[in-house]
Amino acid sequence: MNGHDRNGPAASELKLAGLTPFTTIDFPGRLSAVAFVQGCPWRCVYCQNSWMQQRSFDPGLEHSSWEELESLLKRRHGLLDGVVFSGGEPCLDPALPAAVRAVKEMGYEVGLHTGPARLAEVLPDLSWVGLDVKAVPADGAHWAKVTGVESAQDKWTESLGLLLASGVPFECRTTAHPDYFSEAQLLETAAFLRARNVKDYALQICRKPPGLIARFGAVDPAWPSEPVLEKLRSGFERFTLRRD
C-alpha cells in the first residue's frame, strides 16, 4: 500500500534511516517494529543517533526504505501488534501522515516517539505517543542548552496541550545526565508535568555509547538519589526509571 496523504506526499516518500523488526519495550503493551525516520531539527547533547540528524542520507551508510517496512509488515501479520515511528524526529517528515495511515490500514496500531512538530496531523491515527521532555519545560535557556535550538520549548508546550486534550495514551520521558540536568531540575520538570495532570512519566538515564555530540562520563548508579526518586515517583499513576 502506497498510502497517500490528501495534502502531502505518499508514504513511499518517507525517508527511513533504519528498521528494528521486533521490540517489546518501545510501544507499551505491544509487540512492535520500530521505523527510524531520517532528519531531526534538534542537536541534543545526549543524541545517540547523530547520523540521522540531516534530512539527506549519508552516502557512506546504508539506509532503509518504505518498501522494506511494508514488506516486513506483510510478513509479520499476526506476530506484531504495531509500529513505532522514531528517529531522528519523525514528525519532521512530510510523508509521515500518509505513512501512519497506511500502517493503520494494514491492521497495525501506530506509536510515535516525538518531541514534536506536525503532531496534530497524525494524532487522530495514533494509539500511543512517547513525548520527549528534553529540558525543564518552563526554562527556555535550559532547552537551548540541551537541544542547541533557541525557543525549542514553544512547540513542545503546544504538543503537550494537544496530547492532554486528545485522550490518546502518552508517556512523557526525560533523558538525563547530571552534567546537564540537576536533581533540582528533575524535580521542577516533574512538578510541571504533575500540575498539568500528566499520568505517565519516565526518567531515562543517559547512556554512554560512542558517537555522542558531547562526551559525558558514566552516570553514578546512585544518581539521582533515592530521596529524589521518591519525590519523582509521587503524583504520577506510572513512573518508570530506565537505566539501560
Predicted stretch roles:
Residues W51, G87, V133, I205, ...:
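Residues that line or immediately flank small-molecule/substrate-binding pockets and catalytic motifs
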Residues H4-P9, I25-S64:
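Canonical Radical SAM [4Fe-4S] cluster-binding loop centered on the CxxxCxxC motif
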Residues D58, G88-L92:
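Short secondary-structure transition/capping motifs
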